[in-house]
Amino acid sequence: EIIIVESNSTDGSRAVVQAYADHPRVTLLLQDRPRGKGFAVREGFAQASGEILLIQDADLEYSLDDYERLIRPIAEGQHRFVLGSRHAAGSGFALRQFADQPVHAFVLNCAHWTFATLINVSCGVWLRDPFTMYKVFHRDCIAGLRFESNRFDFDWELLIKLIRRGHRPIEIPVRYRSRSFKEGKKIAVFRDPLTWLWALAKFRFQRL
């Protein structure tokens, strides 16, 4: 099944996804306004019926051709939680390269390693790419969990809660093409890092 949550984007996404509205294996959820990535993913979770859940953004920074290799370890019962890593062994460090905004790219690359170190130290793991969009897991991993984050801090909440439940992810290399802010990247360079720090402090110690 494919569950599409479209938040009334201004980039033409709605017109594209509406073409699949009548497909028998597609569930289309149309929102009246953008409420953030976390809100959209939580809406999708509520509609999902499959045993394996995979999160995919519509901008296609990540290749759809990696689906099989991400799902296979879970489908074969080897692991419960998989991260599609841009920086795992075999893929190198996929530096964000915004030709038109090199300063923004440099800031995001530095921030990635800084925040990755914080989450690794705080949670007792060693992950090269904890903030990857590709998070794939068996639905049992989130059974009984309540999620509340609406923006990109949802990635922190999901990762931290699954690790605290004992589901330590494996990382599998994936292909990645960075999208610049002029191409529609939505991260708020100053606001979002503050929400990430709050999410780390909150969800690392909050009762599950």
Set out the residue ranges of the language-model regions.
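Acceptor/aglycone-binding surface of glycosyltransferases and processive sugar-polymer synthases
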Residues: 25, 31-47, 52, 64-152, ...
